[in-house]
Amino acid sequence: MFSPSKFRKQVNESESVSNCESTTSNSRRILDQHAGLPISSAFRTEASDIGHHFSTKMYFKILSPNNVFALMGDNEFKTSFKIFTIFEPTSTPNGKIQSLITISYKINNVLFKMEKEIFIEKVNIFSLELHIFNFQSTNRSNPASESIHQLDLSSEALVTSTLNIRGNKITTTLRPRTSPYKRAGDASMSREDLRSPDSVSTFTTVLHVFHKVFQVAATYTIRENRSERQTKVKLESLERRLKANEKARKEIEAEAEKWKDRATRNSKRLPELELELAETVQAKEEWQVKSQEMEIQNKQLVEELNEVQKKLEEIENSQKTFHQKVVSTLNLDEEYFQNPDEEQDGSLSQFNMDVLEQEIVKYQEKCISLKQENEILKEKLQQLSSSLTVNQNHVSTLMDHLEINKEQSREIQGICKKEIAIRQDHENRINHDVTLLNSLINEQKMELEMLKAEIRCLRSYSQEMSQSNKNNIILLKSAETERKSLLETLTVLLNSEEEATENNVKRTIRDLVRERDTEQTKRFEAEKAASNAEGVLLEQAKQQRNALFRARVSEEEYSKSMEKIEELEQELLASDLERKNLEHKIASLENCISKVSQLLNVNVGGVFDAIFDRIEELIAQESVYRVVVNENRLISENIFRGLQSVRKDFQSGKSGGGSDKKQPASPVAAAAKIIQERHTLKTIDKMDKLNKDLLATMTIETLKAADIEKTNLKKRMNEQDARIRQLEREKKEGERIRSIIAKWEKRNIPKTEKSSPMKKVPPIENFRAKSQTSITGLSPVL
């Protein structure tokens, strides 16, 4: 007989001594053949290698449950699980094969070793040829590793644990395809062999294994049913989300169309504003040209006034000389008449004296009247000079106003350019927002398509699960029939009439089953708790990752929203400054209008009708004054010609008096010349009127320009107010769209995220709402 203790001593001695020759050549050859073979690969030896007791060949296959355990483990376990035969197998008198093997495996990079004394027995139970291991000896641990865990391959709890972890593979590998035994029986196995106690123990182990397999299959069918219900619930929730997403998509598309319409309207308004700007620039240039022309005309009129004054001075000088000459001539005549010649007659001299006296009286009266008229004309000249100074002052003030208006027009042009640039920026931003909304709509469409595809996959998966459940039900029914057949065979085997009684067999079976059940339940509960703990930890890790990702996204969006708020505040400040500048310009224009009304002696009172009436009167008088000016020019030319003729006549009369003293100068011509001087006074009056008309026309033009600028400013202010209202409406619509998107995002948040530990983190929509409220609280312009 074989003794394990003696063999262990021999093995230790052989390991301590190098190149030991105690082992036989056959054992060395078997070790070399089977060293390092994994348990999943079956090995075979011939009968000649085992011993001389068998003349036929026998095959040794390492099968259930060990190869199942190796197949179901991870890759590390599969590659490291190895079995070695230590000595040459020997046959016992009972027909069994006795051997000692070592089993080694790794779990988590920890090496485990164990030794087993085995008896191999050939039993034909299934359609396949199955060799069962009867592990009769206790575990013998390696002395080098005392604290290492030892795996008991004889226990069925390990098999059930692996079945719980890898249930699908176990059901496919261990599911019996035929009846538990052949009813007809094999030629190599008799009915007496079936009733032996060893065969009964083997059958009990096999029955226990199949019972556990069926339990695992039932648990997996329950789990599949649960997963089927969960998939149905998920399908319903996904359909609800699809409907909500479609509604939100329609609303967003409508909002995007509105934004597009507004963008087109703004683009249509731009050319109109540009045309208005061009018109204002042209009007300003025309006004500048007219002002230059009026300045030139004013200079010409001043030059003409100076020429007329010079002519008046010359006329006064000529009048004085003429008066002196008349006096001198009169004195000469008196002397001549006081000392008459004796040759002349008395009657003729007396007649001439009477005529001269009458003429002199008339002439003196005319001189007195002319002196009075000259005094009146001098007073009028003084008035004209004072009015000229006043007019010059008015012209200087008007020129100052013109320069101020030029500066204001330049500022207005700059403001208009800035406003156009700002409007273009706003339109670009609106277009950018429209593109973003379109991209969001496209992304949501893609998400909807993805959700539809997921729903289709889930439906197909649910159909597959239902089919697999049906197949599992069929397999369970077949397993139940097979279990019934096994129970029948066991009843047949237990009702045998051999040495072992039925009560003893039942007691042993019950004890074994109780022990195994208790161990299996404990291990199953421990493994179940471990798997539940692992699932909880995985869910917590996923929730934490999702929460961190959402927190990062919220921080990024918060920073972006703060940047947008700063930009909007800067735009607000710029718009406030522009409004203040416009108000200042309006006030300056109102002051200009009040000054113009004071100059025209018109009470405006907030209404410009009086100014416009006065302007129309001055325009009507302008045409009349132009006609009068032309007439005055003709009259002045005629007067000048008459004066020249009078001067010539006077010179000719003087020369005649020197040669012939009897011929006196004609006083009628002198009187005619004096009468013509009255026309000069009329020309002076007309020049005064012309100066007044010039002032009136200048003031009218300045008032017209100021009125045009004021109307333009009012239009711009109204346009700015309309633009501000439109921006407020667009802002409200944008807030409404954001609220819709926020609601949609809240609906799409899964339950796992809602129950995550990061509930206290505020969502992105709160930051958006806060930023928007802060913007609206700054000023009502936005």
Curated annotation (Swiss-Prot):
The keyword Coiled coil applies. It comes from Caenorhabditis elegans. It comes from the Eukaryota. Residues 1-25, 175-195, 748-782 are annotated as: Disordered. Residues 769-782 have a biased composition (Polar residues). Residues 13-25 have a biased composition (Low complexity). The keyword Coiled coil applies. This is Uncharacterized protein C27D6.1. Residues 223-331, 348-398, 428-601, 699-743 form a coiled coil. InterPro entries: CCDC170-like (IPR039139). Keywords: Coiled coil. Residues 183-195 have a biased composition (Basic and acidic residues). Disulfide bonds: none annotated. Transmembrane segments: none annotated.
